[in-house]
């Protein structure tokens, strides 16, 4: 049952990406990103990553919602274009959905995914093994490694997000 839940969430995830990649108006692009981000957090939660899913949900959908709201407010149109108002955008949206449904058919026909990697077990996803010490939470070890060995990565990521917000505000401010 969990496999089908992840499969359905993955379909919604890709449909959200198709929705914002074929966006005719910034409002719908932000909506597609919000849907995809929320569903992505649900997928991470389904695999047991409660801390990571919560952090992504709070940081991405909390922090970036401010940026989406600000840029959408600055780029509002009186009559926003929707997916069906332009034939090229509608064609792109339908083509993306068709590709997703063909992928779903291919996966359901063979009962596994073997396009680039073969995902038929979770044993390949083990990150850190401590030998005879028993069961450890991968999340706790990952967070400890991120903040101990990856300090510079956290600093560069925070700085990049700050610069990204400043650049977006300067672009949308106008003259």
UniProtKB/Swiss-Prot annotation:
The keyword Aminoacyl-tRNA synthetase does not apply. The gene is MT-ND6. Core subunit of respiratory chain NADH dehydrogenase (Complex I) which is composed of 45 different subunits. Its EC number is 7.1.1.2. Core subunit of the mitochondrial membrane respiratory chain NADH dehydrogenase (Complex I) which catalyzes electron transfer from NADH through the respiratory chain, using ubiquinone as an electron acceptor. Essential for the catalytic activity and assembly of complex I. It catalyses: a ubiquinone + NADH + 5 H(+)(in) = a ubiquinol + NAD(+) + 4 H(+)(out). One of its GO terms (biological process) is mitochondrial electron transport, NADH to ubiquinone. It is a multi-pass membrane protein. Keywords: Electron transport, Membrane, Mitochondrion, Mitochondrion inner membrane, NAD, Respiratory chain, Translocase, Transmembrane, Transmembrane helix, Transport, Ubiquinone. One of its GO terms (molecular function) is NADH dehydrogenase (ubiquinone) activity. Pfam families: Oxidored_q3. It is found in: Mitochondrion inner membrane. It comes from the Eukaryota. The keyword Transmembrane helix applies. InterPro entries: ComplexI_Subunit6, NADH_UbQ/plastoQ_OxRdtase_su6, Nuo/plastoQ_OxRdtase_6_NuoJ. PANTHER family: NADH UBIQUINONE OXIDOREDUCTASE SUBUNIT ND6 (PTHR11435), NADH-UBIQUINONE OXIDOREDUCTASE CHAIN 6 (PTHR11435:SF1). The chain crosses the membrane at residues 1-21, 25-45, 47-67, 88-108, 149-169. Belongs to the complex I subunit 6 family. One of its GO terms (cellular component) is respiratory chain complex I. This is NADH-ubiquinone oxidoreductase chain 6. It is an enzyme of class 7 (translocase). Gene3D superfamilies: NADH-ubiquinone/plastoquinone oxidoreductase chain 6, subunit NuoJ.
